[in-house]
Amino acid sequence: MKTISRQAYADMFGPTTGDRLRLADTELFLEIEKDFTTYGEEVKFGGGKVIRDGMGQSQVVSAECVDVLITNAIILDYWGIVKADIGIKDGRIVGIGKAGNPDVQPNVDIVIGPGTEVVAGEGKIVTAGGIDTHIHFICPQQAQEGLVSGVTTFIGGGTGPVAGTNATTVTPGIWNMYRMLEAVDELPINVGLFGKGCVSQPEAIREQITAGAIGLKIHEDWGATPMAIHNCLNVADEMDVQVAIHSDTLNEGGFYEETVKAIAGRVIHVFHTEGAGGGHAPDVIKSVGEPNILPASTNPTMPYTINTVDEHLDMLMVCHHLDPSIPEDVAFAESRIRRETIAAEDILHDMGAISVMSSDSQAMGRVGEVILRTWQCAHKMKLQRGTLAGDSADNDNNRIKRYIAKYTINPALAHGIAHTVGSIEKGKLADIVLWDPAFFGVKPALIIKGGMVAYAPMGDINAAIPTPQPVHYRPMYACLGKAKYQTSMIFMSKAGIEAGVPEKLGLKSLIGRVEGCRHITKASMIHNNYVPHIELDPQTYIVKADGVPLVCEPATELPMAQRYFLF
């Protein structure tokens, strides 16, 4: 058998089993665990290459071949780090394996035909589109910013740049829900909208779920009282939707213990569990130790750096409609900013005790930095805590799988949409992001939405080739015309779908049904289901997990930062 060197093979078809790649400029290294190809039968498009008539391309009609093929991709997902071809049909992933022409090639399970378009995945890392579960719908331009960062699903609430939305992720009531569903129908991104769960009687909640909400949000600015929590969870259990909560920072309606009692062992998604974004001061972080609570972070505190504390006070005053001239407002803000709990948050992520990452977009968080800050935290923790259990000196595969799950599969599981999005798996919507390894987590090479390119870095439009400067991210065809309706999805409750909301409003986007929200626990959070016993000293704010103090230094320098954003 003829052989070539690993370097020559990698240059031609991308790395293969046993090869390692550095993620951006971090100290994180992945190692390819398996290659689905048959060596010598790889497919590649181009002049003099394999995917040509009678060679790698068969004669079948469109019904018998994939619509889109990503060749020789390095798939990075919660379930593995592998090299494979990815087949897409009707906007969904239908194959992960070996592509080619079965008439002349062996071991083909993804058929290439005249109806197949090719995306070159050689040397590229491929991930599922990110899911951000903490979106304040303050402005529609967030969709572009999220997409070009690699996020393809927004879950949250709001109605625009008004006081209620600047502070809370809530789309309240039937009229607001209908108008926002009509508006987000035009966005080239998947969307789910939260109704308001801050009410002590059930009917006002039921009507919002029936109006098309994906779930419910309880927020202290609207009242996160024990009765509201109890009532909201009762309706959520009845109608199979998730509840997210920003609990009572001021402890006015009750302390942390009263909130836990009102939750009563039922599943709930706790936002910014560390507390700087809001929640029982100073001990909301103890919710990380509850088996029924799905804990999440928002990105302004992630990772802990020398600048983290300083920027938070002003952000908080703006977002929560506070007045710096009122001492009580200043005290409220200061009660939420604790460097000790912010430091502990990084470590809890690395232990797999905090399950989800999100943004808190324009409301103390940055919509385009969910993915970037997740990997900055992973890098910081490797430097400060060393190799993760199960990893080796050669690769960080376990740590990498843990961190990618935080913004892909786990938020999908938390909100009942994992049957449709959240991973690179057969049957799921083809929301796929391609990365050059040197730019991983920072600037995608291609954002595919529902099987079609939505955004891409594109050079001078009047140039003879696509690459000359200036290169900017620009909207592509999946964002235009009727195509955007066939490549993006609005998620809503079963009750909303059965009530005919999509038909009543004339929604054109794909409609995704929420299911299975109420029977999950923290144990369902993949690679991030550790339930430690959490203690917090109310005087020093030092956090302990299973008796061990969680202390780390702030970072003075981070990867994936200035050197990537000079231009």
Swiss-Prot record:
Binding-site residues for Ni(2+) 1, renumbered to this chain: 134, 136, 217, 360
PTM field: Carboxylation allows a single lysine to coordinate two nickel ions.
InterPro entries: Amidohydro-rel, Metal-dep_hydrolase_composite, Metal_Hydrolase, Urease_alpha_N_dom, Urease_alpha_subunit, Urease_AS, Urease_asu, Urease_asu_c
Phenotype for residue 320 to L: Abrogates activity and reduces binding to nickel ions
Cofactor annotation comment: Binds 2 nickel ions per subunit.
GO molecular function, one term: nickel cation binding
Superkingdom, natural source: Bacteria
Urease domain segment(s): 129-567
Record family assignment: Belongs to the metallo-dependent hydrolases superfamily. Urease alpha subunit family.
PANTHER family: UREASE (PTHR43440:SF1)
Protein's UniProt name: Urease subunit alpha
Organism: Proteus mirabilis (strain HI4320)
Gene expressing this chain: ureC
